């Protein structure tokens, strides 16, 4: 049975959204957001599927990366810094098996930002969100809204 309504307040925000997208190279994708999935709280998952492999990550078990294969056994990679590529191993602050997650990602990003400020120069390939990144997200959101309003595919205009 369903619980009784706890409040008579009318909710006027979007509770669920689903977006279809396609890239210039023809590849397609989708994503969904929900504020009504009971028990999921702030869950964030990514899954990318290709013809030969898939990869999935779940914020509720952030120390694991699942890799699915078509022709061999699937894999679950763990977060052991000793096994990571040197480019990303510095972002792991604890030994393998200890959970690092959402707050750690922001700590790592801000650490990179502060190092750039201290150096007085923007890196060629910044490892933190830039104003350009934020603007790009806003252009994408604008295209999603226009697509919904016009009920057709809309190109993201930068």
What are these regions (language model features)?
Residues 9-17, 22-108:
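NAD(P)-dinucleotide binding in Rossmann-like oxidoreductases
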Residues 1-7:
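Short, small-residue-biased leader/transition segments that mark boundaries at the very start
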Residues 58-61, 98-101, 108-158:
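C-terminal helix-rich "cap/oligomerization" subdomain common to oxidoreductases
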Residues 2, 74, 86, 138-139, ...:
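Residue-level marker of intrinsically disordered, low-complexity segments enriched
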């Amino acid at each position: 049975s369903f619980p009784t309504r706890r409040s008579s307040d009318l909710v006027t925000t979007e509770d669920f959204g689903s977006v279809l997208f396609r890239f210039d190279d023809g590849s397609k994708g989708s994503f969904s957001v929900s504020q009504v999935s009971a028990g999921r709280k702030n869950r964030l998952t990514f899954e990318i599927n290709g013809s030969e492999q898939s990869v999935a990550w779940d914020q509720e078990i952030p120390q694991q990366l699942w890799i699915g294969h078509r022709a061999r056994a699937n894999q679950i990679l763990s977060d052991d810094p000793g096994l990571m590529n040197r480019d990303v191993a510095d972002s792991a602050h604890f030994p393998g098996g200890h959970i690092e997650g959402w707050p750690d990602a922001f700590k790592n990003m801000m650490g990179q930002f502060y190092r750039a400020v201290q150096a007085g120069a923007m890196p060629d390939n910044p490892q933190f969100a830039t104003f350009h990144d934020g603007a790009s997200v806003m252009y994408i959101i604008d295209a999603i809204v226009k697509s919904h309003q016009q009920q057709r595919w809309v190109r993201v205009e930068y």
